[in-house]
Amino acid sequence: MLVITRKKGESFLIGDDIEITVVKLDDGSVKLAIDAPKKLTILRKELYNEVQEENKKATNFNPSILKNIKSK
């Protein structure tokens, strides 16, 4: 893991086309601006983890519940 120290207004690059800028510093939080291509999906980690968990739940299908469905 790379740890980078930046001050307000300073940036760092990831590759050639992603720039992260420190916009605001508060007690216990940092506001970042991310300049990246539109095709790139950017998610907060907790949101990504939540989506992954919901996807796992969606794949837990019990086929025995279909026995209760009447066909015409």
Curated annotation (Swiss-Prot):
Any single biological process term in GO: negative regulation of translational initiation
Superkingdom of the organism of origin: Bacteria
Pfam families: CsrA
InterPro entries named among the record's database cross-references: CsrA, CsrA_sf
One annotated GO molecular function: mRNA 5'-UTR binding
Keywords: Bacterial flagellum biogenesis, Cytoplasm, Repressor, RNA-binding, Translation regulation
Gene Ontology CC terms: cytosol
Location of this chain's protein in the cell: Cytoplasm
Keyword ATP-binding carried by entry: no
Gene3D superfamilies assigned to the protein according to its UniProt record, in alphabetical order: Translational regulator CsrA (2.60.40.4380)
HAMAP family in UniProt: CsrA (MF_00167)
Function summary: A translational regulator that binds mRNA to regulate translation initiation and/or mRNA stability. Usually binds in the 5'-UTR at or near the Shine-Dalgarno sequence preventing ribosome-binding, thus repressing translation. Its main target seems to be the major flagellin gene, while its function is anatagonized by FliW.
Subunit structure: Homodimer; the beta-strands of each monomer intercalate to form a hydrophobic core, while the alpha-helices form wings that extend away from the core.
Family: Belongs to the CsrA/RsmA family.
Protein name: Translational regulator CsrA
